[in-house]
Regions:
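Short amphipathic alpha-helical/adjacent loop interface patches that line ligand
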Residues: 1-2, 44, 66, 116, ...
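Helix-centric, low-specificity signal for extended rod-like, repetitive segments
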Residues: 6, 61-64, 135-138, 187, ...
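SF2 helicase/translocase ATPase core recognition
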Residues: 16-44, 141, 159-242
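Conserved P-loop NTPase motor "coupling/switch" region that bridges the ATPase
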Residues: 1-15
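Conserved Helicase C-terminal RecA-like lobe
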Residues: 16-42, 52-168, 238-239, 244-252
Length: 252
């Protein structure tokens, strides 16, 4: 791991299944620098300007601009092709090399399949073996790939958060990497529990890769404040829904 990257460590106690190995969560803060930082600020300012022109009371417009910023945090070329660098991708590859060198196997989750495709290409270039699963994977092929990984075929398993987050057993891995924060932390917990479940014999470590000083950090702050965050953000009708004003604060 690159020296100097800040880590936030939290140890979790399992209340229901005491016989499970320990699960440790680590938030790895990835700084955006140079052109990558400038590009983020340009996207943020443009989003605010767009919303100031008439969209800041419109939940759908706000969420669309937030989505654009969140995609940029994952990999800038997804939003601005002229920004060639991608600090999060490089941090991920460094982490995967370290884990491979220590003979660990890894589950890698992202909600963005186009980002997963970029990760897949880099993984292939690095010579790492892997399985892949997203919402387009047919059920039979999904079962085959899960079984293959459990048999030892693949250093890592790349998965979309929604397609791979529930209903499968991947205890052959003892590391989990969450590449981008989802609104609802329970969804991330479900993804991590693909490895941390009955049948797991080793301690499990979960890494969250977060772009420093960006909307991703704001989402993590909301994780701590609201347990029903997905409903609050996406349901514009309930009394608990986040107001447009609250959503606008995520751009700060």
């Amino acid at each position: 791991m690159r020296a100097g990257l800040p880590l936030i460590l939290r140890r979790l106690k399992r209340e229901v299944l005491d016989d499970l190995p320990e699960k440790t969560e680590i938030t790895l803060s990835v700084p955006l620098e140079g052109d990558e930082r400038a590009g983020y600020e340009a996207c943020r300012v443009k989003a605010l300007e767009t919303l100031e022109k008439g969209g800041k009371e419109n939940r759908i417009s706000i969420l669309a601009e937030l989505m654009r910023l969140r995609r940029y945090c994952c990999h800038p070329p997804l939003v601005l092709p002229e920004v060639a660098s991608g600090a999060k991708l490089e941090a991920l590859m460094e982490l995967l090399r370290d884990l491979k060198g220590a003979n660990h196997r890894v589950l890698v989750f992202s909600q963005f399949t186009d980002f997963l495709s970029i990760v897949e290409e880099r993984v292939r270039q690095e010579g790492l073996t892997y399985q892949y699963l997203d919402g387009t994977t047919p059920p039979q092929e999904r079962e085959r790939r899960v079984a293959a990984f459990q048999r030892g075929e693949g250093d890592l398993f790349l998965m979309s958060l929604k397609a791979g987050g529930t209903g499968i057993n991947l205890t052959a891995a003892n590391y989990v990497v969450l590449l981008d924060p989802w609104w609802n932390p329970a969804v991330e917990d479900q993804a991590a529990d693909r490895a941390h479940r009955i049948g797991q014999r080793n301690p499990v470590t979960v890494y969250r890769l977060i772009a420093a000083d960006t909307v991703e950090e704001r989402v993590l702050e909301l994780h701590r404040e609201k347990k029903e965050l997905a409903r609050d953000v996406l349901d514009g009708t309930g009394s608990s829904a986040l107001t447009p004003e609250a959503l606008m604060k995520l751009f700060e």
